[in-house]
C-alpha cells in the first residue's frame, strides 16, 4: 500500500476535492511538480493548467485550475485557485469558442490580459482532452 496524504483543492467559490491521495501533479510557475507523501514543505505559485491526482486504487482524476498557489505541509497539500473545474465538467464547445474569441481579439491588439485569457483557455482545453481520452479508453 502506497503512502497517502490529504489533498485539498479549493476555488474562490467552493471546495472541489478533499481526500486521501497517493500523488498530485501540478504546473508550477517554475515547472512541473510531482508531490508524494513526505514531500518537503513548499509554497509556490501555480500557473493555469491541470492538477492531476492519483487515488489509492490508482484512479486518476483531473481538475483545471486558472492558477493560484500550492502549499505542501507534512501531512496535507492544499491547492488554492481562483477557478477550479473538474475535468469532466469542462465543456469543449464553450472552451473552443472562448479560445477563438481570445485569439481573434489578440490578433487585432497586443494585450497582456488577453494573452493570459488565451493561455487559460488553452490549458482548459488540454485538461478536457486528457479527461476525455481517459473516458474513451474506459468504454
Curated annotation (Swiss-Prot):
It is a peripheral membrane protein. SUPFAM superfamilies: Epsilon subunit of F1F0-ATP synthase C-terminal domain, Epsilon subunit of F1F0-ATP synthase N-terminal domain. InterPro entries: ATP_F1_dsu/esu_C_sf, ATP_synth_F1_dsu/esu, ATP_synth_F1_dsu/esu_N, ATPsynth_dsu/esu_N. This is ATP synthase epsilon chain. GO terms for molecular function: ATP binding; proton-transporting ATP synthase activity, rotational mechanism. Produces ATP from ADP in the presence of a proton gradient across the membrane. Belongs to the ATPase epsilon chain family. It holds the Pfam family ATP-synt_DE_N. GO terms for cellular component: plasma membrane; proton-transporting ATP synthase complex. Keywords: ATP synthesis, Cell inner membrane, Cell membrane, CF(1), Hydrogen ion transport, Ion transport, Membrane, Transport. CDD domains: F1-ATPase_delta (cd12152). F-type ATPases have 2 components, CF(1) - the catalytic core - and CF(0) - the membrane proton channel. CF(1) has five subunits: alpha(3), beta(3), gamma(1), delta(1), epsilon(1). CF(0) has three main subunits: a, b and c. PANTHER family: ATP SYNTHASE DELTA/EPSILON CHAIN, ATP SYNTHASE EPSILON CHAIN, CHLOROPLASTIC. The keyword Ion transport applies. It is found in: Cell inner membrane. The keyword Transferase does not apply.
